[in-house]
């Protein structure tokens, strides 16, 4: 059992090392990672990777690291990340309408209720994504330059 864990840990370390040694300058790799982190903060399931790669192309970042960066959101982090994003958006825009019950949605229409939630979620995602991407860029540039790549 201990041997299997050691081998698994070594494989993960090798995969991470391979990922970090992708082509490009430290700045290009950091921009790719930051683009992926930014897109990973948005609730656009299935399109985060594509948008992360597209954004990495715009900022001339590494595409593979952009795809990896989108995994900041995954099945384990969806609920806490999007709840946090919604709370950040609510902090900026105000609390808005309270979360509706089924009767309110049926009477007022889902689009009216959904717009209040969606605007707060998207604004919070933008703010959280920008902060996390900037932090990820800064940390990865420092780490890559220190590693001497």
Can you describe what each PLM-predicted range is?
Residues 122-145:
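Transmembrane alpha-helical segments in integral membrane proteins
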Residues 79-105:
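Juxtamembrane non-transmembrane "cap" segments at the membrane-aqueous interface
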Residues 97-119:
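Short, membrane-exposed interhelical loops at transmembrane-helix boundaries
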Residues 21-39:
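Small-residue-enriched transmembrane helix starts and helix-helix packing motifs
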Residues 1-26:
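Helix-loop-helix hairpins and the membrane-proximal interhelical loops
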Residues 34, 38, 68-72, 123, ...:
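Hydrophobic residues within alpha-helical transmembrane segments
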Residues 42-85:
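Transmembrane helix boundary and interhelical junction motifs in multipass membrane proteins
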Residues 89-97, 139, 143-148:
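Membrane-interfacial segments
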């Amino acid at each position: 059992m201990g041997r299997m864990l050691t081998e698994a840990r070594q494989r993960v370390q090798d995969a991470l090392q391979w990922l970090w040694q992708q082509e490009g300058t430290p700045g290009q790799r950091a921009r790719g990672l930051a683009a992926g982190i930014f897109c990973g903060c948005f609730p656009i399931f299935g399109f985060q990777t594509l948008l992360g790669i597209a954004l990495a192309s715009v900022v001339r970042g590494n595409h593979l690291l952009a795809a990896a960066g989108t995994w900041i959101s995954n099945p384990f982090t969806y609920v806490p990340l999007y709840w946090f994003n919604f709370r950040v958006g609510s902090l900026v825009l105000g609390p808005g309408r309270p979360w509706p019950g089924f009767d309110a949605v049926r009477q007022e229409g889902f689009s009216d209720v959904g717009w209040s939630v969606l605007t707060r979620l998207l604004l919070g995602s933008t703010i959280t994504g920008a902060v996390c991407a900037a932090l990820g860029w800064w940390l990865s540039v420092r780490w890559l330059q220190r590693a001497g790549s």
